[in-house]
Amino acid sequence: MWDRILGEDGYDSIVHIPMSSGLSGSCETAMLLSDDYDGKVQVVNNQRISVTQRQSVLEAKKLADSGKSACEIKEFLERTKMDSLIFIMVNDLKYLKKGGRVTPAGAALATILGIKPVLKIYGEKLDAFAKARSMKQSKRIMMESIKDYLSKQFKDEFENGRYHLQIAYSYDRAPAEEFKKEVEEAFPGIDIYVDNLSLSVSCHIGPGSLALAVTVDSIAV
C-alpha cells in the first residue's frame, strides 16, 4: 500500500498511525518496514487506540491541511500522546477470564457481587481502575474521572471546551446512544462521537462493554 501511495497515487510522504505499541506489535512492525522508505514514511507511536486513534487521524489531516510536513505531524502527535485517556466498563468478566487476565475465582466472585470493572488506557498501559456495583455507577465513575483528569491537567482547555469526547461500545449501539445523552448533560456543548470499540479490545472484554474517552484539542494553527 505504501508503494502505491508514494508511486501511482503521487504522494511525497505518508504519516502512518498504528494502534498503541503497548497493546499490539503492529507499530513496531511498521517502524521496521518504514526504514526502507528513506524517511518518506513517518510511523507515529502516540499510544492511541480505537476512537482516540481516529482523533489522531483527524488531527494529522488538520495539520497537513495547514502545511505541516510529515515529520512535523509525527512530532506533534507523539509530543501530545498523553493528552488522551480512555475508560472502559466491562460488562461480563468471563472474557477476561478466558484470556487469563482475571482468575476464575475472581471472575466468579465479581459476578456474584455484580461488579462491573472499569479499566483505564493511558499511554501504553491498560490497567484496572475501579470496581463499580452497577452499570449506572460505572458510567458515573467514567464521567467523573474524565472531569477530574481535565480539570487537573488541562484546566484551560477544560474551561474553554477545547477537547473531544468519544463513546465506544462492543456489539450493541443502543446502550451507547443512551449513555451519550448522559454525557451530553455532564459535558454540555461538547462534541461527542460514538463508534464501535476496536476489535483488538472488544475480543478481550466481550459484548455489552462501554468506553468513554477524551482527547484534548492541542492544535494551535
Language-model segments: residues:
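Glycine-rich oxoanion-binding loops at beta->alpha junctions
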Residues: 1-8
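Mixed-charge interfacial surface used for oligomerization/domain docking
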Residues: 3, 13, 22, 26-42, ...
